[in-house]
Amino acid sequence: MSTAKSDAAHEATDRQIAALERRIVRLYSTAERGLRERVIAYFKQFEKQDEQKRKQLEAGEITEQEFIQWRLAQIGRGKKFEVLRNKVAEDLTEVTNEAIEQVAAEMPEIYAINYNQEAEAINTDEGSAIPLIMAAAVVLLWHQKSDTMTRPKLNRQKDIAWNSRNFSASVTSNILMNKPLLGKNSICIASITMAVEKSQHSARVNARTFLTNAETRGRQAVYTAAEKLGMHREKTWHTVHDNRVRHQHALMDGITVPATEKFSVDGHDMVGPGDTSAPPYLWYNCRCRMTSKRKKKVVNVSEEQEVV
């Protein structure tokens, strides 16, 4: 188990991620209120028919399966449902796009916080004078060099299709559970809530994913700068010690490599946590971090070697 000293920049990154997640939740809560009105209006069209069918069910005139099949055919399908489903999906994608823009806006600040902490640590260790950086400078750098960090992007058509499937599946699922049509714990409310929660969860995970990328990129930039100035460092991967850490990252805990080289994670080269050049399962929603220290030097003493 790695035992790195306190890491103020990583803690600051975590705080900013938490604050960003709260803003994302508010975005989706606002969107859900508008969507809920539209969904309720759609389901109200079927209120009288649904009551009649339920009375038939209670009277034993139709079976529960026949009642469910009627609901599926009348409520969960057809042109009107497609219009509703598409509107829900498109509106959720708009919210996702806004969330992604907020994530991208936070990344330069995270990059700068982590760059500056590591620069100060190296300057203390090495007696160097690596200059610090401001978030505004990172923004300019990012415009000039697109690979400074991984910019989050939204595939609109893919996201709309995903939201559409989620909403359809939630309506079908709640119909199959034979919930009431309207009301607090109804098909209507549960369906929109489930669709919104899935989209919101994805947006929150994106926040963690890309701010971790910014953290790592800021730190790596300092390590590279130090190496160019003749200061040889090594970096260590640190994982979060809980039951949520993925197996591949648990194996990386405490692994140390030269600061300008890459870690080998499950057979893939990675600059550090959140490196999106690796397959997504190795960086999506990553909570790991990396730190650096002065590289040990080996000097000859007579015929023996001494490590200092």
Give the residues covered by each predicted segment.
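Acidic, glycine-rich two-metal-ion catalytic cores of nucleic acid-processing enzymes
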Residues: 198-307
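N-terminal leader/targeting and assembly helices and adjacent pre-domain segments
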Residues: 1-198, 202, 293-308
